[in-house]
A protein has these predicted regions:
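Helix-loop boundary and gating motifs at the non-cytosolic
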Residues: 1-39, 198-237
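Intracellular juxtamembrane helix-capping segments at the cytosolic ends
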Residues: 16, 99-115, 298-312
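Multi-pass alpha-helical transporter architecture, strongest
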Residues: 74-79, 160-173, 357-391, 398-400, ...
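Juxtamembrane intracellular "pre-TM" segments in multi-pass secondary transporters
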Residues: 169-204, 391, 398, 402-403
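A membrane-interface helix-boundary motif in multi-pass transporters
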Residues: 57, 141-158, 340-365
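C-terminal ends and interior cores of transmembrane alpha-helices
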Residues: 66-82, 268-280
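Hydrophobic core of transmembrane alpha-helices in multi-pass small-molecule transporters
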Residues: 3-4, 71, 84-104, 109, ...
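Helix-to-loop junctions at the C-terminal end of transmembrane segments
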Residues: 42-56, 143, 245-259, 343-344
């Protein structure tokens, strides 16, 4: 399931930049990518609360898969038909609302079936990355890097995701007799998790790191093409190779290293990744693409495992949903609009000033690294915990309020 889900997501996001350019929709590109950010402010928390309290995550993902297939097909048709840009953006936003909760719901499904998430989640999550790569390669094999065919293929892939959900055992959903307030129905009570200082640092670091990272898919393909590298979707998938390697090795790292140093290493690789791209050469840019995957894993996947280990079972779908809001929502929205403005600032009459563009992003990641090293306390510290794993009230769905050491 993770494999096919990754393919469906990759077949839309990776070629989107070049597909919009090929159909004369370059002007809406920053807003098209920002649609994911807007959607992540709304749908992940709502569907996360639904999966925690009302419906099985498997059934939620099944419905989302069908909705994604329909929305992606409509959005692709509007791009191909060169409809009014506002209509195109509206349909892209509709698709974003359907796709934003999918990965956090899928992660919740997987975590619920693992005996040892630290050791097992990385390799299983790698299947999504393999699917992402396969989706990119299929797009390039179909010569659809700039074609609407990429979107139609992705829509069909979402239907395959739906089919896979019928092979999953539906686990019982934790029940609560408490009458839910409107903010609980919308999943806004997940914000309680931010009361824990270490939780807050992990959420904020992930969100801040997302801001410069959003430049990867809109602008790296453009730089690759300017350097004479065609089949950009396939070249971009190089980053997933190191992502997979890192995922298979992450379990061993979590046993030997503190979370603080794993995340710090990922952030440091993020600085190096953008610094290499700033050299403005084929080999250097490709080296930066390769490092992207390793950096991504050490920050984001570690954060997801942290949440599964430190958040009570009745809150885990909302915890993963809040992670989606902070990264896909807050981080992506600020990132796509901010890097779009930064890209325009770096534009010159003879072309983009790529060294300046990538160097600015490297500096931004360096600031995030410094913040994390200073603010995260970790092992040996005791803080007020929202939804901690030993919180009996949280396990019943009531507001959590416990003290627990955070590693």
């Amino acid at each position: 399931m993770f494999f096919v889900l990754g393919a469906a997501l990759g077949m839309w996001l990776v070629p989107l930049s070049t597909v919009l350019d090929a159909h004369g929709l370059h002007a809406i590109k920053p807003f098209a990518f920002a649609a994911n950010g807007l959607a992540a402010f709304v749908s992940p928390l709502i569907f996360g609360a639904l999966a925690d309290r009302r419906a099985s995550p498997v059934k939620v993902l099944r419905a989302l898969s069908v909705a994604n297939a329909a929305a992606m097909a409509l959005a692709t048709t509007s791009i191909q038909g060169r409809w009014n840009p506002w209509i195109v953006l509206g349909l892209i936003q509709l698709h974003a609302l359907c796709s934003s909760p999918a990965f956090s719901i899928a992660s919740t499904i997987v975590f619920a079936r693992l005996a040892d998430a630290k050791m097992e989640f990385g390799p299983i999550r790698a299947m999504a990355t393999l699917g992402w790569m396969a989706g990119c390669w299929l797009v390039s094999a179909l010569n659809a890097d700039q074609s609407a065919l990429a979107g139609y293929s992705g829509a069909v892939t979402w239907l395959v995701v739906c089919a896979f959900t019928f092979f999953l055992v539906v686990l019982p959903t934790p029940k609560s007799n408490k009458r839910l307030a409107w903010h609980e129905r919308l999943g806004l009570d997940a914000l309680t998790l931010l009361k824990n200082p270490d939780h807050r640092v992990v959420f904020l670091t992930s969100a801040l790191f997302t801001i410069p990272l959003t430049a990867f898919y809109p602008y790296t393909p453009v730089h690759l093409r300017e350097l004479g590298l065609a089949h950009t979707s396939a070249w971009m998938s190089l980053g997933q190779i190191t992502e997979i390697v890192a995922m298979f090795g992450l379990g061993a790292l979590l046993v030997k290293w503190r979370l603080k140093w794993i995340c710090a290493c990922g952030l440091g690789l993020g600085v190096l990744r953008f610094a290499l791209s700033a050299v403005n050469g084929k080999a250097w840019l490709l080296a930066g693409v390769v490092l992207h995957g390793c950096s991504y894993t050490l920050v984001y996947i570690t954060a997801q495992i942290y949440l599964d280990q430190r958040v009570a079972a009745a809150w885990r779908a909302r915890g993963q949903a809040l992670f989606s809001l902070m990264t896909s929502g807050l981080g992506n929205l600020i990132g796509y609009l901010g890097t779009g403005a930064w890209f325009a600032t770096c534009a010159r009459p003879l072309g983009t000033h790529w060294p300046l563009f990538w160097s600015g992003l490297a500096a931004a990641v360096a600031v995030v690294l410094v913040y994390f090293l200073i603010a995260y306390h970790g092992r040996g510290k005791r803080f007020l915990t929202a939804g901690s794993t030993d919180d009996s009230s949280a396990s019943s769905g009531d507001p959590p309020n416990a003290i627990q050491p955070i590693q």
